[in-house]
């Protein structure tokens, strides 16, 4: 995960994504989980594969304009590919659930492994060019509509979830949609605030299961941390 977060060029990011996906796939082998979770493996890792291919396509597209570019200076014409690559992994563009959910991974190291693709994708969102889709207003409007739908749907599902565990993916999608909207509005660096809330406040909520009566005030502190977001 650190390799993906601190990757300076797209080649290193592709390698890191493949490595993380491979480790997660090995940990999610059908013999180690329920039949329901095993049935979702092709869908989840199919989405991950598409996101990696989109990242590779964006790398090639960027090289045609600026050979050897870094992730801190993504060419504008390659931005749409990087947006799709990150959006697929976050479940925002298009709306999907690229996360494995089972009782075996409620807490501990399994949760950290689940959040690895999320953290690396948020790092990509924060580095998207400021003029993303500036010359393609139709695509920009379409992506904004899709992102808004994803945010509203995920927020509703999170509020009406039967349990904290079942609502977890929708927390990720809802806040990731806010981060994506920042990039679509030309303020990609502002997405770091939403990404931080997703990971820090979200991790506190995720790990606080089942709740412990004596420290029930701790999740409230995590929620209060969102108040200062722009």
Q: Where do the protein language model's features map onto the residues?
A:
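Transmembrane alpha-helix interface/packing and boundary motifs in multi-pass membrane proteins
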Residues: 154, 158, 222-229
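Transmembrane helix-loop boundary segments of multi-pass membrane transporters
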Residues: 134-139, 190-197, 230
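Alpha-helical transmembrane segments of multi-pass membrane proteins
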Residues: 22, 119, 145-152, 198-203
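Hydrophobic residues within the alpha-helical transmembrane core of Major Facilitator Superfamily
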Residues: 50, 83, 125, 152, ...
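Short helix-boundary/re-entrant hairpin motifs in multi-pass inner-membrane proteins
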Residues: 81-143, 166-170
């Amino acid at each position: 995960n650190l390799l993906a977060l601190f990757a300076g060029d797209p080649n290193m990011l592709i390698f890191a994504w493949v490595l993380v996906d491979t480790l997660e796939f090995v940990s999610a082998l059908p013999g180690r989980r329920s039949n329901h979770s095993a049935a979702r493996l092709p869908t989840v890792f199919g989405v991950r594969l598409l996101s990696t291919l989109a990242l590779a396509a964006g790398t090639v597209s960027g090289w045609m304009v600026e050979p050897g570019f870094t992730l801190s200076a993504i060419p504008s014409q390659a931005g749409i590919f990087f947006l799709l690559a990150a959006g697929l992994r976050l479940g925002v563009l298009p709306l999907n659930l690229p996360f494995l959910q089972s009782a075996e991974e409620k807490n501990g190291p399994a949760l950290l492994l689940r959040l690895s693709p999320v953290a690396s994708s948020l790092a990509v969102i924060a580095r998207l060019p400021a003029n993303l889709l500036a010359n393609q207003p139709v695509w920009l409007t379409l992506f904004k509509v899709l992102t808004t739908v994803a945010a509203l749907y995920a927020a509703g599902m999170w509020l009406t979830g039967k349990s904290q565990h079942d609502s977890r993916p929708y927390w990720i999608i809802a806040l990731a949609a806010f981060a994506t909207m920042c990039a679509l509005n030309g303020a990609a660096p502002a997405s770091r605030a939403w990404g931080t809330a997703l990971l820090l406040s979200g991790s506190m909520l995720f790990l606080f299961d089942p709740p412990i009566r004596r420290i029930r005030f701790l999740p409230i502190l995590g929620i209060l941390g969102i108040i200062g977001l722009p």
